[in-house]
């Protein structure tokens, strides 16, 4: 029987209200493959573990960074490891229980009919049951006519249901352990699976670094510079060779950028995190690789790296493969840089991979002129590249071709 227009409207309304990160991808087969799952505790309560150890201690040593599970956290780990008992087509690969969230990596074998949502939902229910046991809620004997606030009494009114809400954060038995929904990431290659395993393994160390140097991971929002104005941004687009020849494309590009820029009550603003001393440095150089200079890239790379090794801070959006090649070297040689980001920062944003450690070791600033926009796969348009490159020029106070004209 087809859905009525009213039912379709209700479904669409619920889907629109759901956070982007929790929406499922209609093109993904959730019945087979690798999945990296993240669950958050209700109200982000840090009740599953504590982080102990010292940064830099070798793995396996008593003082190595690790998560010390609470009794509830240990039960969560136990429930995760018993998933194959109920879903034989599922293989458990790795997991870590952080104070306020859970990471797990699993593999769903081809040919199975189980949906990932069913597997995760069963795991969440089992964890909530353990949580209720911890709280002393007699959930095994409860039923809808006997809410936890009125066991054994007269048939309750709807208002008597203490643990009921529209988002299913609670049931009539008690509060849930995890908030509704989960974030899933689908690693495709074995290399990506290995990256996720390493990410899980280093969670405790990352948290210790973040906790010890929290100022470096704090996002400073809506900051201003007298040189960073809307007219500067729009002129950077208008000066582009392509847009000079196409008035309509120029206006469309400028409007697109206006929609993405970070505005506050005063003007366009900047958000950033990391070692703010790098932003105040007088020794900054822009890195912008142009196709016209492709044959001279090795020369440009050599001069940029020489400058960085001599105390200069590289400023770049690291858009092109050549720019990213230099970024990789900067990271490997522990050299400082300022990275212009192609998206805004979410509330819980932090750098990932080697950039996380660069930030923790005061070697990096990430700065954004954009509003945050959730995208599974980000595509950078021409006008965004122009804006980010202009910001790198403003920060460094040097033109693109400085490396052709001077030696440092």
Regions found by a protein language model. Name each.
Residues 219-408:
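Glycine-biased, small-residue-rich flexible motifs in mid-sequence functional cores and linkers
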Residues 1-232, 236, 241:
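Short catalytic/metal-binding and nucleic-acid-binding patches
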